[in-house]
């Protein structure tokens, strides 16, 4: 019998060409920007209407914040490109605001207005890997050539559907994409059957990757707007931050997280419910 792990590797290898970036970044059809940024936001069933509204409003406010605007326009080209995507289970990803160039405060306000105007709804399961793979495809033929390409993933639980999150992360990083994380630890110490108390460590070990990648945990919804603002300043700044200043959760080597914990929890509870 063909081993499952080998089969999965072969399938990913065949899928790889679909994720390769455009060959010529300098083509005249592509607009040069300092950063191409995918904001990938969790809307799985654990998110209620109020939480989803907080997320949308938090990003809209941050994108028009003076410090964030300064970061956007501080690079070599003085402009960035951003898209906003909501995600849940594998195959459940929805682009709320397509790629838009932001080169002025008016551009940023227009993006924020679109973000607040779009409908929001939640979906089943949590596929961080699906979000990363979909976000990776969004860079292809998007009309922009960024000096840096970043996927920002926010979520309140571990991956429990789709390919293993480490494989999706490694594929994106191998294509020159940086993945940053915003783990939402906003339950006040109460955890559901599919959640884990060490989501901050999980994001560091299993989700983020690439040069100067970072994870910025959010411990309460009251912290969310400021966390998003700070994260965007770091991601959009035209200069690299010293690694010592990046807000990464540091963990000891021996505390390496089980990156399949979400899948194991899902199997455990599905089996118990039979």
Model regions and ranges:
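VWA/integrin I-like adhesion module and closely mimicked acidic/polar interface patches used
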Residues: 158-205
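C-terminal "exit" segments of structured domains
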Residues: 216-274
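Bacterial N-terminal signal peptides
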Residues: 9-21
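Short beta-strand-loop
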Residues: 75-114, 191-204
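Sec/Tat signal peptide C-region and signal peptidase I cleavage site
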Residues: 20-28
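Second-shell loop/turn segments in exported
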Residues: 40-50, 82, 98, 114-125, ...
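Von Willebrand factor
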Residues: 31-98, 106-154, 181-191, 198, ...
């Amino acid at each position: 019998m063909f081993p499952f792990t080998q089969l999965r590797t072969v399938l990913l290898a065949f899928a790889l060409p679909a994720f390769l970036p455009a060959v010529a970044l300098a083509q005249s059809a592509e607009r040069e920007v300092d950063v191409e940024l995918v904001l990938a936001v969790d809307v799985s069933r654990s998110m209620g209407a109020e939480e989803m509204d907080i997320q949308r409003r938090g990003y809209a406010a941050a994108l028009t914040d003076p410090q964030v605007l300064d970061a956007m326009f501080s690079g070599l080209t003085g402009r960035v490109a951003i898209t906003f995507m909501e995600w849940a289970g594998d195959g459940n990803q929805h682009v709320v605001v397509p790629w838009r160039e932001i080169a002025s405060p008016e551009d940023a306000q227009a993006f924020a207005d679109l973000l607040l105007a779009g409908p929001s709804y939640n979906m089943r399961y949590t596929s961080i890997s699906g979000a990363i793979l979909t976000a990776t495809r969004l860079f292809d033929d998007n009309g922009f050539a960024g000096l840096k390409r970043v996927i920002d993933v926010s979520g309140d639980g571990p991956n429990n559907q789709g390919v293993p999150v480490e494989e999706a992360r490694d594929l994106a990083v191998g294509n020159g994409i940086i993945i940053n994380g915003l783990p939402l630890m906003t339950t006040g110490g109460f955890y559901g059957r599919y959640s884990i108390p060490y989501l901050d460590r999980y994001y560091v070990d299993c989700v983020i990757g690439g040069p100067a990648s970072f994870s910025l945990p959010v411990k309460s919804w009251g912290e969310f707007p400021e966390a998003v603002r700070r994260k965007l300043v770091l991601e959009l700044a035209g200069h690299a931050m010293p690694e010592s200043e990046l807000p990464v959760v540091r963990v000891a080597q021996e505390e390496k997280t089980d990156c399949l914990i979400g899948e194991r929890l899902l199997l455990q509870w599905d089996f118990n419910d039979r």
